[in-house]
Amino acid sequence: MSNENEKSIVEYFYIGERVKGDDGSVGTIRYQGKVDGFEGNWYGIEWDDPKRGKHQGTVKGKQYFKCINKGSGSFMKYEKLIKGETFMKSISDKFHQKIDNYDDLYVDSTKEDIKIQIQMIGMNQTRENQKKFIAQTLLSASYLPISEIDESPLIYNNFKNLIELNLSNCLLNSWTQIVKLLKQLPNLNRLHLCNNRLSFNIDEFKKEVNSNNEYGNSIDDCNVKDLILVNSNLSNWSIVSSICKYLFKNIESICLSSNSIENINLFKSILNNDNENENENENEIVEQQQQQQPQYLFPTLKSLDLANNNIKSFNDILSSLGNLPQLTELNLNNNQITDIEFNGDVDDGNKSNNGKTNQFKNLKRIYLSNNKINDWKYLDKLDELQSLDELSFRNNPIVDSLLISNSNNSNTNENEIENDIENNNNNIKKDNNNNNKNNKNNKNNKTIFLNRLNIIPRLSNLKKLNLSDITLLERKDAELYFLYENYNSIDKFKNNKKLNYLISIHGEPVYTKMSLQLEKEENGK
């Protein structure tokens, strides 16, 4: 192969380009060129699936490129790689329809300043096909090899009525491309971008955001309200805040599950870290800083899904999200959270006179299953939320401890608990999503039952726990059980606010665990 041909082949792909291997695996090109000890030119690929890789970009001790995930790199020849396509080509190939703007095809007439439109064979059928696209409001382009966005107005002319678009598992590689796409889809309401690897180049992004094309398309026309970004390599929260501020100003729901996010206290937008505005006066700087606060970045956000990340600090979440005015749902399942605290008091405005926190003021649903919360005092804190009525709280250490505590309690009537479990069978089945209804393990049933008994009394306004409704009878039974377990009839001043509240509803219990224990000790003497 000649040097000229070799060069053209190497330049066929570029660094950062998203490609498919001949086995269907998807990766990003991190290197192109020679590899010592091997003939020809090679592409260094970082695969999305680490199992597809063989090394860290190192061959015989020499580092050619680096990988985020351990062992996700390998080298490939160009013959083994599949290049992406434009949005319109991938869509038209999928539906076997050729889409072109035939109205722009003309030839010059012999008469001055007159052009004659070309009449293409089959053009009427093509226009009919275009009408079908234009009528579409939902389009799934998931797994298509889309790597480029067509110039305006090609996408607009064919898909301007789209309301929902799924571009998950494609080959797009930058947020600049997404800006270019959104300008042509003014009616888009819901966008899926899962399992893409979108880079963020500040200069390119700003240039595309601030530009209007000859057809008048602007990013201000974007109307996306629901954004799904599962496993999209968005661990940097500054990027999240920047794209939402400039692209998704009307966003109501964001799913950022499985992005390796560790903290979310970096709300300052990347775009304001440059020095373009060095001459701004002090008032303008203060105003700009205020606009970086969460309530300004996400004024319409109602639902945020941060499940399956590595978040450890609830305080980070509180300081960053606690003042969002519209937030009603927060999913923190499968993280590393160990505690829950609400800062401040009545004097600093963070708490109301009734002891409720003014943070997360409109939060109705919070999901905290599969975290590392190991003390009931942190769960008690959730009762300070003004609007909370639904909670998910499975598989935390404090829940697992219930069964151990119960098994060591000599005063526990085992048969009574078994009967209660049988009587509450419907709630138990709902709590397990109706899976394996007739084959539940007794240990799991008991854990679920004890979990509900210990959580429901602590959260007075809770209406749903672990996807199961809380009935009035269940709440009464749970609160009476809670009084039996925790009420101090000997020294009533040691009873906390929650116990005194339950006493005001149900009255002072005749028998408690403490009184029965004392009676047993007296009888023993």
Curated annotation (Swiss-Prot):
Residues 33-77 form the CAP-Gly domain. Tubulin-folding protein; involved in the second step of the tubulin folding pathway. One of its GO terms (molecular function) is alpha-tubulin binding. Residues 422-444 have a biased composition (Low complexity). Residues 414-444 are annotated as: Disordered. Supercomplex made of cofactors A to E. Cofactors A and D function by capturing and stabilizing tubulin in a quasi-native conformation. Cofactor E binds to the cofactor D-tubulin complex; interaction with cofactor C then causes the release of tubulin polypeptides that are committed to the native state. The keyword 4Fe-4S does not apply. Keywords: Chaperone, Cytoplasm, Cytoskeleton, Leucine-rich repeat, Repeat. LRR repeats lie at residues 300-321, 326-347, 362-383. Belongs to the TBCE family. It comes from the Eukaryota. SMART domains: CAP_GLY, LRR_SD22, LRR_TYP. SUPFAM superfamilies: Cap-Gly domain (SSF74924), RNI-like (SSF52047). GO terms for biological process: microtubule cytoskeleton organization; post-chaperonin tubulin folding pathway; tubulin complex assembly. One of its GO terms (cellular component) is cytoskeleton. This is Tubulin-specific chaperone E. Residues 441-481 form the LRRCT domain. Signal peptide: none annotated. Its main location: cytoplasm. It comes from Dictyostelium discoideum.
